[in-house]
């Protein structure tokens, strides 16, 4: 899976798991259709909606030189009812 970097676990993304929505950081050059195809193929689920936003890079200083990290894209993927991604399911205790 070249386009998907990793799953995101923030307060908001954990709250969205209850709505059957999963959050991933993806390559900034990937398109929505590519990500949808990869998620459906790799996890064996049906995607009904996708939301995305671009997160800006941050400044990093190395001595007198000011650099920056690369920006990246975050996708919130909504699955059809009845489908889930097993390793990302929130366990209730």
From Swiss-Prot:
Keyword RNA-binding: yes
Function per UniProt: Binds to 23S rRNA.
Subunit (UniProt): Part of the 50S ribosomal subunit.
InterPro entries for the chain: Nucleotide-bd_a/b_plait_sf, Ribosomal_uL23-like, Ribosomal_uL23/eL15/eS24_sf, Ribosomal_uL23_CS
Record SUPFAM superfamilies: Ribosomal proteins S24e, L23 and L15e
HAMAP family: Ribosomal_uL23_B (MF_01369_B)
Compartment(s) where it occurs, according to its Swiss-Prot or TrEMBL record: Plastid, Chloroplast
Gene name tied to this protein: rpl23-A
Single Gene Ontology MF annotation: mRNA binding
Highest taxon of source: Eukaryota
GO cellular component: chloroplast; ribonucleoprotein complex; ribosome
Keyword Zinc-finger: no
Primary site of residence: plastid
Pfam families per the UniProt record, alphabetical: Ribosomal_L23
Listed name of the protein: Large ribosomal subunit protein uL23cz/uL23cy
Keywords annotated in UniProt: Chloroplast, Plastid, Ribonucleoprotein, Ribosomal protein, RNA-binding, rRNA-binding
One Gene Ontology term from the biological process aspect of the record: translation
Recorded family membership: Belongs to the universal ribosomal protein uL23 family.
